[in-house]
């Protein structure tokens, strides 16, 4: 199935990025990456689905926002049983989203603006419409997938059994939807195919890959039963007891991929979506000869409380440092409720974001969070498209509602694939553009300062100590050297800067500061410290 990509006429490669962009091979260590969920981002042909030309049209908006790179969720040829995470052709663009020429133009224009492109890679499973699986259903070459004569007790992440019976009586494994059969990564042909897929997109100029279900692919020998347990197996996600995730053999795959990435110029990279049992297990994915980044989902799932945030930050930084990798922070994505809703309101979400953007390492944003969008909780059941909803009653559609661009009815969309709430007109990019206190302009200011301030981005942090902090477990204070303090107040009462032993200029605050000498509740500030005299 190997193919030769056609030459790209005059496209900018990463080594050709313009002055002022992140041009070194380690650009990813402190990059801010913006996740684009293409079907929900921007629509240019009026069919209600976002597309690649829509992303291209909004590159100016993304450049003004200040992001370093875009991560594009799947746009490949797919029957869309799981919103593109069921891939039928890994080397082409689904007509819903455009063409390969549209993709090439997007890459070229993004590179011209100094924005890098990361694409989703889905290696654990393909679509059941993939030519390989169609061959398998005919009884040919079933060794590319996982077939057996009788199922074990494994359950699908989406609910129900992880096995479906074929017409001839065998069963095939699908850890997600039945339309997403698991590939057999013990087969050398599967491994060779994905090495070729990597090269195909690298040759087209992509700067990296987000590896979907990076903890998957390899299963325990013999496919043993999970055994008796309480509740659904999905509740064990990230537990070392699960015989189909986080197996040691998956690291052999990444050690095969790393030399391919390193053989291309410009610092090509890969980031793991790995749900594992601990930061120690996560650090194994970012060893020097494997992947470059792995999302800190512990940070995303932490309770909104200073003590919880600090515990996760300390552990994550310590484990990543042992293998020389940066920590990769994230608060929202296409699989989890938006953090405005998860943390209990916009003020808290803004405070958590300003904390995240002050931490050493890389940060990933999810499209629409810069507008302060909440989770949509009242979508009609008949409009939901998430396969998990059909099998378990749980749905991710609420975080996938299309973005509001204008304050007009429809928010810039004509009959979007999911309805946009009427009150989102006030949250639209147009409505927030000229409002200095808007969430959009908070993100712009934070990303600008992150680029300009020598203390932000890479480096280390130091926890600040004060008697007040011993009494106030709902307050977190840290210093980024040189001279920047970050204070988060998750409590219900203001905290005095003087009591923390801090003095200086507030460069940025996530919310109003009625008392300039204190940090208000549910607020994070970035404070330029006044130099102390000897």
What is each PLM-predicted segment?
Residues 1-504, 509-534:
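Active-site and adjacent substrate-binding regions of carbohydrate-active enzymes
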């Amino acid at each position: 199935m190997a193919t030769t990509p056609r030459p790209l006429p005059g496209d900018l490669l990463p080594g050709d990025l313009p002055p002022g962009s992140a041009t070194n091979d380690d650009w990813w260590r402190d990059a801010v990456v913006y996740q684009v969920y293409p079907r929900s981002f921007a629509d240019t042909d009026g069919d209600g689905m976002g597309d690649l030309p829509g992303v291209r049209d909004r590159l100016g908006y993304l450049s003004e926002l200040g992001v370093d790179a875009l991560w594009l969720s799947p746009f490949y040829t797919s029957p869309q049983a799981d919103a593109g995470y069921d891939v039928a052709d890994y080397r082409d663009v689904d007509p819903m989203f455009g063409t390969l020429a549209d993709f090439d133009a997007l890459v070229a224009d993004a590179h011209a603006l100094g924005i890098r492109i990361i694409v989703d890679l889905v290696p654990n499973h393909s679509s059941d419409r993939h030519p390989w699986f169609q061959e398998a259903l005919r009884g040919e070459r079933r060794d590319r997938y996982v077939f057996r004569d009788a199922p074990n007790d494994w359950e699908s992440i989406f609910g129900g059994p992880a096995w479906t019976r074929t017409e001839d009586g065998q069963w095939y494994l699908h850890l997600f939807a039945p339309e997403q059969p698991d590939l057999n990564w013990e087969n050398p042909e599967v491994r060779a195919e994905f090495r070729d897929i990597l090269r195909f997109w690298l040759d087209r100029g992509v700067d990296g890959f987000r590896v979907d279900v990076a903890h998957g692919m390899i299963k325990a020998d013999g496919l043993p039963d999970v055994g008796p347990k309480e509740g659904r197996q999905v509740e064990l996600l990230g537990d070392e007891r699960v015989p189909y995730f986080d197996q040691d053999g998956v690291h052999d795959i990444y050690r095969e991929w790393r030399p391919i990435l390193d053989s291309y110029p410009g610092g090509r990279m890969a980031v793991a979506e790995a749900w594992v049992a601990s930061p120690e297990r996560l650090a194994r994915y970012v060893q020097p000869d494997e992947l470059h980044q792995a999302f800190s989902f512990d940070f995303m799932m932490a309770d909104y409380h200073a003590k919880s945030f600090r515990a996760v930050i300390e552990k994550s930084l310590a484990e990543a440092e042992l293998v020389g990798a940066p920590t990769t922070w994230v608060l929202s994505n296409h699989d989890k409720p938006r953090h405005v809703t998860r943390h209990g309101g916009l003020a808290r979400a803004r405070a958590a974001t300003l904390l995240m953007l002050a931490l050493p390492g890389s940060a990933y944003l999810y499209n629409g969070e810069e507008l302060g969008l909440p989770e949509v909780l009242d979508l009609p059941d008949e409009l939901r498209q998430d396969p998990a909803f059909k099998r378990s009653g749980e749905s991710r559609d609420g975080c996938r509602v299309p973005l509001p661009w204008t304050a007009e009815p429809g928010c810039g969309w004509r009959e979007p694939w999911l309805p946009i709430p009427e009150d989102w007109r006030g949250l639209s990019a147009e409505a927030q553009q000229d409002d200095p206190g808007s969430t959009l302009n908070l993100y712009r200011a934070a990303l600008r300062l992150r680029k300009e301030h020598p203390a932000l981005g890479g480096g280390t942090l130091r926890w600040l100590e004060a008697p007040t902090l011993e009494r106030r477990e709902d307050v977190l204070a840290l210093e980024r050297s040189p001279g920047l303090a970050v204070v988060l107040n998750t409590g219900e009462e203001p905290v005095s800067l003087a009591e923390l032993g801090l003095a200086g200029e507030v460069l940025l605050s996530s919310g109003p500061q009625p008392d300039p000498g204190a940090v208000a509740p549910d607020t994070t500030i970035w404070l330029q410290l006044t130099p102390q005299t000897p």
